[in-house]
Amino acid sequence: DIYAVVSDKSDSALYFNFRIQVNPKTGELEQIENLGFTERTDGTLNDGKPWQGKEKGFDHEAIVKVSDSSLVIASEGYCRLKEFPILPTSADAAKVGYQQNLWESRWASSDFYPNYNFESLAFDSIRQYLWTIPESTLRKDGQPATPQNGLANQLRLMRLDWGKIKENRNKEDNGKEDSSEQVSSKKDSRYMTTYAYQMDQPSTHKKADIYVMGVSELCALPDGQLLVLEREAFIPKIKIGAFCKCKFYQINPLNSEGFSMKENFSSDTPFLKKRLLTEWKTGLSLSKRSFANYEGITIHDILQNFWLSILMIISTLRGKSVTIRDRQFMQSRVQ
């Protein structure tokens, strides 16, 4: 019942540990407790002493556990996906020999529009696949969706074969290949398969003070399919009338045609077929204050009534508050 949660504002805590207890019958949240953090952003243990790292502006947006000893975190500020060791929970814990040759994938910031790069991660532990997708359209693929242009974001869903990546890293550790960071990064494309994903168009044409339209999270299902959270956040200058519209789609990329990173989008592009599971809208009005910006998803468990319980996390665009809520889907609806 311990979950790792990243913060897009912290330059000291790598992630926070939350104890989340859910009713096994109803799926309702019963208790949420922030246990603090054990690991710093530089990968060292938090010993409780004042500390300030040399690097700042990570803007960590997503986290997945990829093994018993490591996890991967997406940094929007650094345009990277990076593996970190899972450290002991206390300074008195026995020292363990951690893997040093950890994986990292960096992208050029020029590939993305501002604040529109890596927002999501999902890990399929059964097939050892690491999934991610840019939040919005890449620069080389066109303009991001806005209320004014009415475009549908065209994204590139990426599947990294984590099993093969780690197998290759183990060979490097044994001295069979060059283990330099630069060389290893160039080889990652050998283990990556990409797919074309098209979002829905903006639902409004009104002028916004803040507007965000993109995929805010992915979630890997046990059968190899994915849940995709499309999120549209609209905030006018006067704030009244702000809304956040979310749509949950189910896709099956493993049974779909791939789309190379070198290919250009066209009328013949094999976009992934998507099935709408549910959608909801929250907002801000004179009488109602329900605005909720959903940014994280994880599978909790199968409930006693055979429903699939999914935990979701929300945060404000200004970073002033973070809460956790839950939504449920019948297992038969996501198979």
Describe the function of each predicted region.
Residues 1-335:
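Sequence/structural signature of beta-propeller domains
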